[in-house]
Amino acid sequence: NLSTDLWSTMGEQRQTNYALRAPDKATFVELVTEGQPPAPGYFVYNAILNRQDRDLLDETEMPPAMTYGEVRQVVDSGAILVDGRSPEEFALGHLRGAINIGLEGRYAEFAGSVVMPDVDIVLVTEPGLELEGKNRLARIGFDRVVGYLSEPYQVMFSHRDDVRIASRLT
């Protein structure tokens, strides 16, 4: 139960906050975590990063645009291809090996659950959403976006042998 107050004092919180009346740390933790979903998979990694001195995220810095050949080279070397387009667009056609994590949903949380944090990432997005994809991943500590596929629809049209189609069940 979160208060709408913009500020408070420790004295007031000790009187009114149920969790601060817990007799010990274990009871406090139990009270404040009751009914909460489990922490996302990336949470421990992110907590460790939060304790380190790190450069500030430049939210205006675009990831590098990459050609199809450059993308294939880094993916073949172990990078993950994260396709942030809608599930419908992904199903109609995506590059071999791509993982669909749509930007319109819980993008960072889902990516943090399926992508390892120590792996390079290449993005495929709708044109103009590359920076959003990079920034949302960086906010959970996944700052190894090495670039994005430039002109994804033209690339898929030109390299049909590397395009896969997926069925969607509803």
Predicted segments, located by residue:
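Accessory terminal helices/loops
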Residues: 1-147
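Amphipathic alpha-helical protein-interaction segments
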Residues: 150-151
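Active-site neighborhoods of enzymes that stabilize oxyanions during catalysis
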Residues: 154-170
